[in-house]
């Protein structure tokens, strides 16, 4: 069995796991400890390419250079980071997100919002990431509540919004909200705090803290004006 394509389908966790499996398939001798060193992946695509098909509207792992693997026994989330693991093909079909229950819709939506906000305020933002981040923020602001209430047109726009946010943060990177969410996400509540819920808890506090910096405050003000606050 030597597949030349690997397909990861589902929410962020299954697709992220498939990204790691892809590396082990191509390089069986590689250890997980090798992969957790940032931007230290071996060259992939020697055996297979990767297609990601998301069925939730939050992580945007289908367009990013990141994967998060959780060790529940140790209570640790390991972020894997390397442009090698950016999928070759992403199939972003909103129909696949229509069966998300309300809580999952809320949590993944706040993950997408946090991706976009952190990308826009990132010190690595640029003219290419800003439009993606701002438009994603506007879409989530307008559509998340309706998506939660079962509006499938809003659900479809949320699926696209999270992908835009992913393209933004995969290039501009993220901030301390995600740092804390990853560190605490696997450490409490019997081993897990839902990632989007952790982001939602930390984002207001981090905005207040970051806004002490004039440049960050100006970027947050841009966001507020753009969405009509």
Over which residues does each language-model region extend?
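Short helix-capping/linker segments at secondary-structure and domain boundaries
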Residues: 120-125, 172-174, 207-218
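Glycine/threonine-rich beta-strand-loop-alpha-helix active-site module
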Residues: 3-95
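Gly/Pro-rich interdomain helix-loop hinge
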Residues: 186-229
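Buried hydrophobic packing segments
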Residues: 17-22, 116-117, 137-143, 162-166, ...
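Glycine-rich phosphate/pyrophosphate-binding beta-alpha loops
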Residues: 58, 163-199
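Carboxylate- and glycine-rich phosphate/diphosphate-binding segment that chelates Mg2+/Mn2+
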Residues: 66-172
């Amino acid at each position: 069995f030597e597949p030349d394509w690997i397909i990861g389908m589902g929410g962020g966790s299954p697709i992220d796991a498939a990204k790691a499996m892809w590396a082990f398939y191509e390089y069986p001798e590689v250890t997980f400890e090798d992969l957790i060193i940032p931007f230290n992946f071996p060259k992939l695509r020697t055996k297979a390419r990767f297609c990601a098909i998301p069925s939730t509207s939050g992580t945007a792992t289908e367009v990013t250079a990141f994967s998060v693997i959780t060790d529940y026994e140790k209570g640790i989330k390991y972020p894997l980071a390397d442009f090698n693991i950016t999928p070759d093909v992403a199939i972003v079909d909103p129909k696949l997100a229509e069966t998300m229950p309300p809580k999952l819709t809320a949590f993944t939506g706040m993950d997408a919002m946090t991706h976009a906000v952190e990308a826009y305020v990132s010190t690595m933002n640029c003219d290419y990431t800003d439009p993606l981040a701002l438009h994603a923020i506007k879409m989530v602001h307008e559509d998340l509540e309706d998506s939660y209430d079962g509006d499938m047109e809003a659900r479809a726009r949320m699926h696209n919004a999270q992908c835009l946010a992913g393209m933004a943060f995969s290039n501009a990177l993220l901030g301390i909200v995600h740092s804390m969410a990853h560190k605490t996400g696997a450490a409490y509540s019997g081993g897990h705090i839902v990632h989007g819920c952790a982001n939602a808890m930390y984002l207001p506090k981090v905005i207040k803290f970051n806004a002490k910096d004039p440049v960050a405050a100006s970027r947050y003000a841009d966001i507020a004006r753009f969405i009509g606050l």
